[in-house]
């Protein structure tokens, strides 16, 4: 299935949509896309395990059965390794999280960090690390961590979905019940993007992709993939009746990949 939506706000000149080869309904959620757009990562709705899926052929390979592996896995810049979480429970049934590294070429899985109550991926020396801790927006740069939370540090303001721009200069985040924002590494120059930009992802340094979803508290009723630019352009990329969600982006190949409510994977191909 394939069709084309022509741009109205001119974020993209055109966008084509098609179901990924071999994609079937099931317990499946999109978890990531490689920097070169050659493969995606999928997990279950409970973030158990990771699968590598060739984006062109649909060929699938199981990488790990780790609990929690599907929650924000990190793909290396060369696409050859993945850092993923491993959730375990101690003798008191307390939840602990470790980090494993998956070598895709060797097919190996090794422990990177032992399980702990709180765990962070890096020290921010090569690139700032942004993350959520106690529902607050945090950043680590050169081993120093600080609470940014530009919209307020209080129990009423909760932050989710943080990510660093490709050039490493801006932070994208979402304030629950309010909307998506962008700020600099100091938590300043705060810019509101949109209320209906949930699960936001950077497409490039000036463009953000998110979802505008509606639910009844139990199931999704509608969801469209949206594009936003920092200078205020907005474009609906998919019809809301298709209920496409949780986009992942690869601007190098002009790709936006998303998953349907039934677990099928869809690919959007963009032209600037």
Regions found by a protein language model. Give the residues of each.
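Bacterial N-terminal signal peptides
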Residues: 1-4
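Sequence signature of WD/YWTD-type beta-propeller architectures
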Residues: 9-272
């Amino acid at each position: 299935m394939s069709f084309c939506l022509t741009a109205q706000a001119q974020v993209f000149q055109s966008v084509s949509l098609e179901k990924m080869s071999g994609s079937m309904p099931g317990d499946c959620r999109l978890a990531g896309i490689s920097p070169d757009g050659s493969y995606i990562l999928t997990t279950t709705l409970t973030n158990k395990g990771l699968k590598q899926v060739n984006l062109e052929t649909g060929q699938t390979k199981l990488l790990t059965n780790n609990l929690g592996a599907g929650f924000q896995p990190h793909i290396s810049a060369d696409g050859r390794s993945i850092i993923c979480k491993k959730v375990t429970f101690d003798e008191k049934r307390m939840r602990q999280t470790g980090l494993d590294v998956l070598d895709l070429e060797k097919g190996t899985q090794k422990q990177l960090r032992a399980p702990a109550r709180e765990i962070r991926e890096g020290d921010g020396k090569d690139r700032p690390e942004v993350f959520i801790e106690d529902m607050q927006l945090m950043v680590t740069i050169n081993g120093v961590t600080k609470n940014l939370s530009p919209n307020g540090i209080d129990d009423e303001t909760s932050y989710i979905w943080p990510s660093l721009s490709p050039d490493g200069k801006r932070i994208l985040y979402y304030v629950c019940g309010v909307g998506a924002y962008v700020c600099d590494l100091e938590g300043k120059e705060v810019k509101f993007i949109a209320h209906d930009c949930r699960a936001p992802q950077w497409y490039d340094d000036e463009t953000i992709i998110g979802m505008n979803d509606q639910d009844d508290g139990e199931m999704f009723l509608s969801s469209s993939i949206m594009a936003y630019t920092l200078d205020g352009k907005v474009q609906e990329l998919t019809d809301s009746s298709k209920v496409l969600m949780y986009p992942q982006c690869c601007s190098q190949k002009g790709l936006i990949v998303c998953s349907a409510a039934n677990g099928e994977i869809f690919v959007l191909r963009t032209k600037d």
